[in-house]
Amino acid sequence: MGSSKDSASVTNISVEEHFSVSQSSPGGQFVGPTEEISTAAEALIGRSTTLTEALKAASMNVGHKPVETTDVAAIKEVETRAIGGDIESEGGVTAVASKAVARNQKIGKDNEKTNLGDVIAEIDVKVTRDREVTSEDAEAVIRAELNHSPFNNIIPGGVAESVAAAYKLNHDPSSL
């Protein structure tokens, strides 16, 4: 029997008003969360925010947590969109995050695992091109994080939420 993750599908993602996600599954439709974006975005107020700056905001918010598969999916989407194409298989932030997840799965203690902040710390060296966050970027990153989450949720203050907050700031700086 398949898991709920296998049978659920993301049908609508909107970052225009508030961050909201609609999903349908065999048990019905889930809509949520509809809430204000976290305060990680406060570091980005005052100018157009780029994709890598949104990653840095996530690092400030939840950088202490061990890197997980959901983070890798969201980071890959950000990195691909920032550079405008295929990412390097070995040298990019996605590769570093993937290796960290593989290492973390072998380690039992959370305090010994590689955390999100460690991975994102090298973003300026690893990603040499960048651009302003768009609604399409935010929606794609949210979708990537959701599709790789074992619980079909977004990490509060994580990569997807920080990218959505960056888009909201770019679109309407008075939204926070």
UniProtKB/Swiss-Prot annotation:
Source domain of life: Eukaryota
Positions of the SMP domain: 49-106, 115-171
UniProt signal peptide: none
Keywords assigned by UniProt, alphabetized: Cytoplasm, Nucleus, Repeat
GO cellular component: cytosol; nucleus
Places the protein is found: Cytoplasm; Nucleus
Keyword rRNA-binding: no
Function: LEA proteins are late embryonic proteins abundant in higher plant seed embryos. The function of those proteins is not known.
Family in the record: Belongs to the LEA type SMP family.
Protein name: Late embryogenesis abundant protein 49
UniProt lineage: Eukaryota, Viridiplantae, Streptophyta, Embryophyta, Tracheophyta
